Amino acid sequence: METMPNWLKQRAFLTPDRTAIEIEEEKVTFMQLHEKVVSVCEHLTHVGVNRGQKVAVLMKNGMEMITVIHALSYVGAVAVLLNTRLSREELLWQMDDAEVICLVTDQDFEAKDIPVYSFAEVMNGPKEEASIQEEFSLREAMTIIYTSGTTGKPKGVILTYGNHWASAVGSSLNLGLRDDDCWLACMPMFHVGGLSLLMKNIMYGMRILLVPKYDADFIHKALQTRGVTIISVVSKMLTDLLERLGEGTYPSSFRCMLLGGGPAPKPLLETCVDKGIPVYQTYGMTETSSQICTLSADYMLTKVGSAGKPLFQCQLRIEKDGVVVPPFAEGEIVVKGPNVTGGYFNREDATRETIQNGWLHTGDLGYLDEEGFLYVLDRRSDLIISGGENIYPAQIEEVLLSHPMVAEAGVVGMTDDKWGQVPAAFVVKSGEITEEEILHFCEEKLAKYKVPKKACFLEELPRNASKKLLRRELRQLVEEM
């Protein structure tokens, strides 16, 4: 199969009156969404957007962003999705790197070298008949999303129509589909996790309740009253929701809490079991079009810390020095599947280094147990090497989070004259606790060389728009000490 019918157009034909998107009190059917997208196409065509061009999108979650993303696929342009939290300089660099022909935005932004189109101004301007793709070629690029740049400059990950299709199919085979499914979308759509929900929305014909920005109070209420069956979260969001739930429970129709961004502490999972909240832990990245592994809720306590097994059409193995290692041996996580990117835009060297014989070398460290369950230890770039010993920040963070007075924790390496590196901890308190008490608590639960040499208190930890911990900012704080 090399082509498919235009996804949204086909969905509007099959189920025109079914609700596609809910935002606050607004409801839009698939046919209404299609009509909105055609209108956006006609306005974008007038300003010169054509097939094969790359168009930057700098917008917040909302109906406008949804219609722009679909409109670019309708005309055959590639959407370069930009993170709204980046600085102007970072955004200009990414647009230059991606060779975009213009920027479409809902924000105030100026750029000397490329046209900047305000969405509102474009929609108030003239229309021109658009050439709409009736079919999508699965090999063609649909989106470019930049990696966070944990090592060096960010790289533009090219994701094809085929990658997005395979990701949605793999997720449905994993989680199943129900007629009444509604996915609450609170992740930014400029991240692959948020974008993937737009793909599932039109492929499954599934209703999405879109939250323009993260609001724990609204989300908690929506889970109780809006018929939500699935939500994607990270540990911080899950903690926020459990705090609001208190002694209560969510409706029995709520069937899946899809947890990404790293393993959750066991006490958190035990609370979810007590309250009947099915947590599916996942592992994925931009390069895999969202999740590539999932741990079923059936195993959430018996396989604590595991990200599960690969999706049906995907493969995973652990390598060290180019050799596949046996169970429990630590090494680099290497993955393969139709949802995996073919490479980075204008980065041939990085593509060759990362993707070898179809296998993507993730840069993450982990191991498989005897049953093939994946355990992610850490980013290779986050590894702390102290006196020749490997220390995984995630392990120390798990210990810190098990203390009742610790709400959030982040660990990074700091330079040490004797050991090369030693761990340093950053903590957000949920009650009264001293640095000495934290370090003593760690001494009781960790090998001596893993105990943080310093614990600093912050009002909040630095996180990205998906609420993932930004270790690089913690490393900067360490350097400033």
UniProtKB/Swiss-Prot annotation:
Q: Which Pfam families match?
A: AMP-binding (PF00501), AMP-binding_C (PF13193)
Extract the InterPro entries matched here. Answer: AMP-bd_C, AMP-bd_C_sf, AMP-binding_CS, AMP-dep_synth/lig_dom, ANL_N_sf, ATP-dep_AMP-bd_enzyme, MenE
Tell me the superkingdom of the source: Bacteria
Q: Which GO terms describe its biological process?
A: menaquinone biosynthetic process
Q: Which GO terms describe its molecular function?
A: ATP binding; o-succinylbenzoate-CoA ligase activity
EC annotation from Swiss-Prot or TrEMBL: 6.2.1.26
Q: Which residues form a coiled coil?
A: none
**What are the UniProt keywords, alphabetically?**
ATP-binding, Ligase, Menaquinone biosynthesis, Nucleotide-binding
* Pathway it works in: Quinol/quinone metabolism; 1,4-dihydroxy-2-naphthoate biosynthesis; 1,4-dihydroxy-2-naphthoate from chorismate: step 5/7; Quinol/quinone metabolism; menaquinone biosynthesis
Can you state which reaction this protein catalyses? 2-succinylbenzoate + ATP + CoA = 2-succinylbenzoyl-CoA + AMP + diphosphate
Q: Please report which protein family the annotation says this sequence is part of.
A: Belongs to the ATP-dependent AMP-binding enzyme family. MenE subfamily.
The job of this chain, per UniProt, is described as: Converts 2-succinylbenzoate (OSB) to 2-succinylbenzoyl-CoA (OSB-CoA).
Q: What is this protein called?
A: 2-succinylbenzoate--CoA ligase
Which gene is this protein's source?
menE
